[in-house]
């Protein structure tokens, strides 16, 4: 091995390197994308990106969230609906929504029943933990009360997005995640499922939801 490395180094006109010298980058463009943008400006970026990723974009506020949610559910054909066991439903005044007969709340103690409920569901709904404006991506920090199947087995995916969760791009999301206890599963969801062949023929809904709606709560 030493002779092999020596031969390569001699061809390159230098000594064999035995350690790594990390480069000192002069530029870090990933840090400056949308730098200085306000939350309203990032919201506009997200809204525009949704037009490119086949995702319906809806704005509302806390007071009107319940009615908006009912309208979105009706537009997608109603239940069954599967949701995470998430305290934010109560925080946003949606506790009564969870009592609907067509709503199944994920229960970590019920094992396979959760997956079967997600398979039957027309709508899967989660809250976004971090939202990337640049790509229109919802970031889910999954846990025992929020299984992965909620967001990919139902026909339609609905994300509830407090405006405060919107950041410019993946760079900021990575910083936020590093400061947390990193979960075993982090999902990045960018609209409905997409697949394309070598000729770039795009097909929506092959490996997951056929439709997606983002509901942004603008005052939270």
UniProtKB/Swiss-Prot annotation:
In its UniProt record, which GO terms are filed under biological process? Answer: lactate metabolic process
Gene3D superfamilies from the xrefs? NagB/RpiA/CoA transferase-like
Q: Which domain of life is it from?
A: Bacteria
Q: Which family does it belong to?
A: Belongs to the LutC/YkgG family.
Described by its record, this protein's role is as follows: Is involved in L-lactate degradation and allows cells to grow with lactate as the sole carbon source.
What name has this protein been given in UniProt?
A: Lactate utilization protein C
């Amino acid at each position: 091995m030493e002779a092999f490395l020596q031969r390569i180094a001699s061809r390159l006109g230098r000594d064999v390197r035995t350690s790594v010298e990390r480069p000192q980058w002069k530029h870090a463009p990933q840090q400056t994308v949308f730098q200085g943008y306000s939350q309203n400006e990032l919201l506009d970026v997200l809204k525009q990106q949704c037009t490119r990723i086949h995702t319906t974009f809806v704005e509302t506020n806390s007071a009107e969230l319940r009615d908006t949610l009912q309208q979105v559910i009706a537009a997608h054909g109603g239940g069954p609906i599967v949701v995470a066991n998430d305290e934010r439903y109560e925080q946003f005044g949606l506790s009564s929504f969870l009592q609907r007969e067509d709503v199944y709340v994920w229960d970590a103690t019920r094992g396979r029943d959760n997956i079967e409920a997600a398979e039957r569901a027309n709508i899967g709904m989660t809250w976004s933990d971090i939202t990337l404006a640049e790509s229109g991506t919802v970031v889910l920090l999954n846990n025992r009360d929020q299984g992965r199947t909620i967001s990919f087995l139902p026909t339609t995916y609905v994300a509830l997005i407090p405006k405060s969760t919107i950041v410019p791009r993946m760079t900021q999301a990575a910083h936020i995640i590093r400061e947390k206890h990193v979960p075993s599963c982090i999902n990045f969801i960018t609209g409905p499922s997409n697949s394309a062949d070598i000729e770039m023929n795009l097909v929506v809904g092959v490996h997951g939801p056929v439709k997606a709606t983002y509901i942004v709560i603008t005052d939270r």
